[in-house]
Curated annotation (Swiss-Prot):
Alphabetical keyword list: Plasmid
Superkingdom assignment: Bacteria
InterPro entries: Aldolase_TIM, Pyrv/PenolPyrv_kinase-like_dom, TIM-br_IGPS-like, Tobamovirus_resist_UPF0261
Protein name in UniProt: Uncharacterized protein y4oV
Protein species of origin: Sinorhizobium fredii (strain NBRC 101917 / NGR234)
Length: 285
């Protein structure tokens, strides 16, 4: 048996204590999505606090838009299980969470969550999520048994299994529901990340985000004052954006990046490096 397999992973309560210690010290909690083992390894090298893997990570690092994760291009829950063997062995000490499709009608959720814990995941997040869907389509999903309430139930079940839970919320009502379900960290989702080659071109303004995040914070704190709040998505795409939000939302404890943590940096770095090589000039023959 290798030394790595003997490493004791921190418990949920130990992780929460760690995060609260950082908050008291004025340090932001920074989480990130990883669509490849290299992304996860690099994020850990940057001292990230938590890593989440889910189907959209694989899609975006394959050059497809993140919303591909909401469409029928693959089994989201099986993709996460497949990604585990790529990511978990190369992450040495950072908690890795699984994105779970809570509305999957082909999964016995308590059994699946126990399997994820046994594989080595420290916790879960609700992704893919119907929270990103609106209009009549969302209404019909809710009416036909594929609802956000099922995602809340999944988070509650994960909490009962002592898994760390970091669900996406999209408004105050979601924040209340997830806080009541026992969620440890709420991630206020501001929509698809804008910018880059395959990012959204339209979305909320920063001012819109400030108002909505503060509403979510207020609603969640009325249920539990110990809950941790992070921001994610929309126009919050780089460190300066996150700094602005944390300054304008004192109750927000940090940032969770997905496209902003692996896609945008990769796009920029590879393009820049390629252009630098292309700029080399040699004497004509």
């Amino acid at each position: 048996m290798s030394t790595d397999t003997l490493v004791k992973r921190p418990t949920r309560s130990e992780l929460i204590d760690r995060f609260h210690s950082k908050i008291r010290a004025g340090e932001p909690i920074i989480g990130g999505g990883a669509g490849t083992g290299l992304s996860a390894k690099s994020e850990e090298a940057g001292d990230i606090d938590l890593i989440v893997i889910y189907n959209s990570g694989r899609y975006r690092m394959a050059g497809r838009g993140s919303l591909a994760g909401l469409l029928a291009y693959g089994n989201a829950n099986q993709i996460v299980v497949d990604m585990a063997s790529e990511v978990l062995p190369v992450v040495k000490h950072t908690p890795v969470l699984a994105g779970v499709n809570g509305t999957d009608p082909f999964v016995v959720m308590p059994t699946f969550l126990r399997e994820l814990k046994e594989i080595g995941f420290a916790g879960v997040q609700n992704f893919p999520t119907v929270g990103l869907i609106d209009g009549l389509f969302r209404q019909n999903l809710e009416e036909t048994g594929m609802s956000y309430a099922q995602e809340v139930a999944m988070i509650a079940e994960a909490h009962n299994l002592d898994l760390l839970t970091t669900p996406y919320v999209f408004g105050p009502d979601d924040a209340v529901a997830m806080a009541k379900a026992g969620a440890d960290i709420l991630v206020c989702h501001m929509g698809l990340t804008t910018g880059g080659a395959i990012g959204a071109q339209s979305g909320k303004t920063m001012e819109d985000c400030v108002a909505l995040i503060n509403q979510c914070i207020k609603a969640a704190r009325e249920i539990r004052d110990d809950i941790i709040i992070l921001c994610h998505g929309g126009p919050i795409a780089n460190p300066e954006d996150a700094r602005f939000i944390l300054g304008a939302c004192p109750g927000c404890h940090g940032f969770y990046g997905a496209s902003s943590m692996e896609r945008l940096p990769t796009e920029e770095a590879i393009k820049s490096q390629t252009l630098a090589f292309k700029a080399i000039r040699r004497k004509p023959a």
